[in-house]
Amino acid sequence: MKSPGAAPAPGLVAAFRALHHDRAPEDPLVLPGPWDAGSARVFVEAGFPALATPSAGVAASLGYEDGATPPDEMFAAVARIVRAVSTGDRPVPVSADIEGGYGLAPAELVERLLDTGAVGCNLEDSADGALKDPHRHAEWLAEVRAAAGDRLFVNARVDTFIRGVTDPAEAIVRARLYVAAGADCVYPIGAPPEAIPALRAGIDGPVNVGAAPGGAAELAELGRLGATRVTFGPGLQRQAMAAVREGAARLRS
């Protein structure tokens, strides 16, 4: 079953790709993570030029644990988010976290994504708690790129840090393979701030850094360290739920 939606306009994908280049060091691309249509509109109203869905945040909004969302529900949720920010004459590009691709063949995965209207995707390189073979994963990413052409921005997640491999050199090896395979950006999730300069120096392409939601000064510092773009995973969704819990508690007090 395909999610309702329409493929993004080529110009929207190109605009999203351009946001990752020629940025001042202290001005990384900040991509809030909407978990539903309402939160997406809030972020757009705040002036953000693009969004990136977090799979864990979307899962929580649908009542699932992270990693347990059925693919049809994830694609449908992404389509709703895209639709919510595509009204009017200035649609906002949305990139979708689709975890490990849900076992779909590259061509089918690309078409499912395009059906949602997303301009890009996150694809991770671990499964069932273990890192994938980087060469095989790079081959798979190359198939995704071949199927997508320039219609999708591919953000290749590198999971070494969250799988206990703390040496940035290991992340760089994987990142280089993925960039050579056609990834537009790499995301060494869980990289500590002190590792960012080495990652920046060793990777030929945009680098996504994950962060806790913070202020402009913290984001600028990540940019100076080498982050091209900053995302927050489910952090904003969890902040929102904390506020809901606080409000619920007040109703009972």
Where are these regions (language model features)?
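Alpha/beta enzyme core
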Residues: 2-234, 238-246
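C-terminal segments
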Residues: 245-253
